[in-house]
Amino acid sequence: MPGGRDPMPSHTMELPRLIVIGEGNMGDLGPFLGSLGGPRTVSLISGRTVQGATGRKIEGSLKRSGIKWSWHMAGTNDPESIASVQEAVRSDESGMAVGIGGGRAVDTAKMAAFKLGIPFVSVPTAASHDGIASPFVSIKGDKPHSITATAPLGVFVDIGVIRKAPARLLASGCGDLVANMIAVRDWELGRDRKGEYYGRYAASLALMSAKIVMENAARFAREGVDERVVVEALISAGVASCIAGSSRPCSGAEHLFSHALDRIAPGAGLHGEKCGIGSIMMAKLQGQDWKGIAGALKSVGAPTTARQIGLDREDLIEALMTAQGLRPERYTILEEAGMSRRRAAALARVTGVA
């Protein structure tokens, strides 16, 4: 090799082919799916509420496009529920799985499509997390972190639908975006301490997505959170993970903290809320502007304390102490800090989280 360098290992990037963001455009879903290969039959994975709110427009659009469809309800994202939907999609002899809804529907469709080897299309109805455009899914009762499935072939967003979702979901999405600041710094640590692959472009894209929230927080506080800005940032973050070939640019110590809380206090807080709270504490450990992160989260209406999401001080301390052990191969600031009970308690206190 020139300069005596060892050859770099192969790196595969699976990216969305087509992304459409509009407003009042849910009735155009049929032509969108047709442009992705013209499936004759599609499986629509959703929830009852979302089906009731969007079903008529979607079905009319599919009918006009000559596409047959079947609806399947997403469960609780446990392996059994996903397997049940997967078998239903298999029975459809479907050419595409379409996830319509929040995290559960999108993740279920993503995993079913991956297992069956068919294309997956993401149709988010809430901007609560960056999984809408990434290849990763979170499965309850499986691994204590996200696992790789398949990137969406297409992403279709109706901002009008996103706007009708509870404001809490949008604030959660902002928390998931701010977390990228922690994740990228942890990725740099992995590169420097362990010789881990580091993709500068993917890292920059993830950081840009986080900065969108940080730089617009004051405006969002005055005028309300701009749904389109957050949606575009979440999609960019998902694409950053696609480019990296791993969740590294968007998942670091703050996500391990969130996954630890999933085990300690199931059902407490949304994913992005826990990642946002974790980001405040991890930023303090990393020497980043943790006060700025806390201020930005407050500006968008996201929680910044344990009490706001129904957790107590002991929950946080336990999560901080056990988080790194959930994924020991992923080097983060938690491994460097050596999180003892005393240090965890001090961190929660100093940052005002608990």
Swiss-Prot record:
Binds 1 zinc ion per subunit. SUPFAM superfamilies: Dehydroquinate synthase-like. One of its GO terms (cellular component) is cytoplasm. CDD domains: Gro1PDH (cd08173). Zn(2+) binds at D176, H255, H271. Its EC number is 1.1.1.261. One of its GO terms (molecular function) is metal ion binding. The keyword Zinc applies. Substrate binds at D130, D176, H259. Transmembrane segments: none annotated. GO terms for biological process: glycerophospholipid metabolic process; phospholipid biosynthetic process. NAD(+) binds at G103, R104, A105, V106, D107, T125, A126, A127, S128, S134. It catalyses: sn-glycerol 1-phosphate + NAD(+) = dihydroxyacetone phosphate + NADH + H(+); sn-glycerol 1-phosphate + NADP(+) = dihydroxyacetone phosphate + NADPH + H(+). Keywords: Cytoplasm, Lipid biosynthesis, Lipid metabolism, Metal-binding, NAD, NADP, Oxidoreductase, Phospholipid biosynthesis, Phospholipid metabolism, Zinc. Pfam families: Fe-ADH_2. Its cofactor is Zn(2+). Pathway: Membrane lipid metabolism; glycerophospholipid metabolism. It is found in: Cytoplasm. Homodimer. Catalyzes the NAD(P)H-dependent reduction of dihydroxyacetonephosphate (DHAP or glycerone phosphate) to glycerol 1-phosphate (G1P). The G1P thus generated is used as the glycerophosphate backbone of phospholipids in the cellular membranes of Archaea. Belongs to the glycerol-1-phosphate dehydrogenase family. This is Glycerol-1-phosphate dehydrogenase [NAD(P)+]. The gene is egsA.
